[in-house]
């Protein structure tokens, strides 16, 4: 009962805060609020400089492959299971999917830095 009560209160509080943020927007934004803080000085250069889209795509690709590799980390413990053929097959399928994804990225020139 206490868990249900705590869950209900937390859910209602979260919903209340979300509703308040939509109902009470910032009514008078001005330029000084949107500028980055520079210790009281005017910024020396623009704070919102664009970065390369190629870098963004390579970074996202790295994160996806890194996450998929992290799925293989518990493999030594999983090999101690009684259903070893299923575990080996699923691990090999994951490695094959990773290899196919890397091959696709490489063939589509997603890993090249040349513009």
Curated annotation (Swiss-Prot):
It is a multi-pass membrane protein. Its EC number is 7.1.1.2. It comes from Pongo pygmaeus. Its main location: mitochondrion. It catalyses: a ubiquinone + NADH + 5 H(+)(in) = a ubiquinol + NAD(+) + 4 H(+)(out). This is NADH-ubiquinone oxidoreductase chain 3. Keywords: Electron transport, Membrane, Mitochondrion, Mitochondrion inner membrane, NAD, Respiratory chain, Translocase, Transmembrane, Transmembrane helix, Transport, Ubiquinone. The lineage of its organism: Eukaryota, Metazoa, Chordata, Craniata, Vertebrata. GO terms for molecular function: NADH dehydrogenase (ubiquinone) activity. It is found in: Mitochondrion inner membrane.
